[in-house]
Amino acid sequence: MSNTHVPEPHETNEQRHPTNQSRSKVTYNGLASVISVALPIAMYFIFDKDRFKEDPLLRFATILLPFSYSATQYLFLLYANWKSNYKPEDTLHKALYYSFNALLIAFATISILSIVALPIDGWGSRNDIVIHSVILPFFVVWSAYLTFTINCLIMKTIRLTDVNFCMLIALMMMIRIIVEFKSSNREYRYYRQMPTPMFRDTFLPTIKRMVSILTTMLVLATFMYAFIAWKCLIFLRNM
């Protein structure tokens, strides 16, 4: 008997091209997220309290990048869901699908309104400056970045490469380093020595875990954006 050679299936350039494009988008998305968080924090350390209180343009520049990033990411995800071939069949999946899209619309709308409303409202205290230049940019960018990345992973358009995951961990560590460096140099040395690959090795990106992370993050993001919307409504009511 003669052995018959059966050619193994392989990916064509056309099949690999969309995946490479998706990986590039996630890489650029990660860089944009780091810049969107780092710039407001840098402005917090560069300018003093009185400058923030007196200059509305400075307040506008502080929140423009993170909230623009947030609105762009949620609108992009909404557009991707609308263009996808996924059509929920049963009632439960339809409810989850349309609820997710409704959250994306709400988050994008609140982000756009915040760019207009939050800078006009004077940041009178140091706590207000910290909230608007450190806390809100971090959580706004973090939630949008995680939603984008995990959604791509669940849809299997990319793989969780070392670059993408280390960028995600670096984003979280960078915020803690910058915020705590001002008060304790010992904390900075500790975080600097934390091995990022350790997180990668212990984190298993299963679909079930990613869905649970996405669900938890969306719940936290809902409360956060509700707080932002409440601040915007109070300001608009007092105008």
UniProtKB/Swiss-Prot annotation:
- Coiled-coil regions listed in the entry: none
Which residue windows does the record flag with biased composition (Basic and acidic residues)? 7-17
Q: Where is this region: Disordered?
A: 1-23
Domain of life where this protein originates: Eukaryota
UniProt-listed InterPro entries = UPF0328
Family under the similarity heading:
Belongs to the UPF0328 family.
Protein name, please?
UPF0328 protein ECU05_1660/ECU11_0070
Source organism of the structure: Encephalitozoon cuniculi (strain GB-M1)
